[in-house]
């Protein structure tokens, strides 16, 4: 796995921890998310999907390139 793919997966893990922290904080206070928190959480989940998609594509491209090199 390339360094770029590793960085993307690390970034995704960091965003997930932030999102989880937001949910955990609201749960600890026995309340729903505020409108601002809800917007932040929605942005984080969108970022999670985008980062994961980018990482998956990068990894697939690396595997394709590796297979092409091996077939030569």
Regions found by a protein language model. Name each.
Residues 1-72:
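Intrinsically disordered, low-complexity terminal tails
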